[in-house]
Amino acid sequence: MTRGLRNNNPLNIRHSADQWQGVATTQTDKSFVQFQSMAYGYRAVWKILDTYRLRFRRERLPYHVRNIITRWAPPSENDTEAYIRHVVRLSGLGGYENIPRPSRYRNFERLKKTARLIAAMTCVENGISMKEVDMEAIWKGYDLAWPGRRVPEEVEEVPVLEDVSVWDEYWDWSAFASNWD
């Protein structure tokens, strides 16, 4: 099991001054936050992405997949271009496709774009397939972030791309070996 999944922190959020809800009582990982449940890990992701939207607006940057991932996984620490390619491939979103601000959604179809982005980023961060992503936990994370904003009947599985073998031609998985048992 990967470090992110073991920590209930699917996108590997690092320790910081942020006071997250649902943090596990015992923090044994020196680098990454450990959450009580995967839903709380996803809650933090939704909140971070909402904050990105505000920052991008102030900086007059478009809020699209490429900019989000470049901020999340900067080139100084990651192969950002490979990360973007994989997220685009897995999510079915375009690299320059605008993503709606999570806290201000008016249309569930648009909000599903953000859920697909989060699911694809979970795959890249943890080396898993879209089939293995817990979409229910992603939506529970949204509900924890903004209670009462989403109608429960709206939960829907994100389409899964079957052929993920293309990852290997672009991605050097050995760089992530330290995150795995």
Features from the language model and the residues they span:
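Cell-wall polysaccharide-cleaving catalytic domain and substrate-binding groove, primarily
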Residues: 1-181
